[in-house]
A protein has these predicted regions:
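...captures the hydrophobic TM-helix bundle architecture rather than a specific catalytic motif
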Residues: 1-192
């Protein structure tokens, strides 16, 4: 009786497993905030209300979603040992994310100083700033991590051998982008 040779299945790296676990955990937290936002839509006893003060952040959304493309191109460039292209695409990702974060800051300035909407104003203000702020916090963390990688790369410390680690970090950025699609839909489409 002959047996077929068996091949060992490679286990995913600790980085991949760790990032996947973190994304699952963060997804649960975002789900709680999204459900709370949906539950409290229209329950504020006083204004301002979403339809009165929220504009669609279209350019910011396009910038953030485009950053998923640029980070994918950066990872591909690093895998192909194209370090100049990696730095360019990685920088583009940071620039697009920074534009998104800046647009969020401008929106908040407008809401606070022109519409007097703060986290304490009403249920809408509380749930809006909690959900959108939680996302903005994740964008900020992502930008800091992306910035560190760029600094190391410009110093020559990021090589093709680091492509898997860079790709794992890109998963976080894709997660931040995917969460924004949900937040945008809930806050700016359904919630208005």
């Amino acid at each position: 009786m002959t047996t077929a040779p068996t091949t060992a299945m490679a286990l995913p790296s600790r980085g991949r497993v760790g990032m996947a676990c973190m994304i699952i955990t963060e997804s649960a937290l975002f789900t709680i905030f999204v459900v709370a936002y949906l539950y409290y839509i229209g329950k504020s006893l006083s204004g301002p209300y979403p339809r009165q003060v929220l504009d669609l952040p279209v350019l910011a959304t396009v910038a953030l979603l485009s950053s998923s493309i640029t980070i994918t191109l950066a990872v591909r460039a690093l895998r192909g040992a194209q370090h100049g292209a990696f730095n360019l695409w990685w920088f583009a990702t940071i620039a697009l994310g920074a534009f998104f974060l800046g647009a969020t800051a401008v929106e908040w300035d407008h809401l606070i100083y022109q519409h007097n909407l703060t986290i304490w104003t009403n249920l809408f203000g509380t749930t809006y700033y909690t959900l959108v702020g939680f996302h903005a916090g994740h964008v900020t963390i992502g930008l800091l991590l992306l910035g560190l990688v760029l600094i190391f790369s410009l110093a020559g410390a990021v090589r093709t051998a680091h492509a898997e680690r860079v790709e794992v970090l890109s998963w976080y950025w894709h997660f931040v982008d995917a969460v924004w699609v949900v937040v945008f839909t809930v806050v700016y489409v359904i919630g208005r």
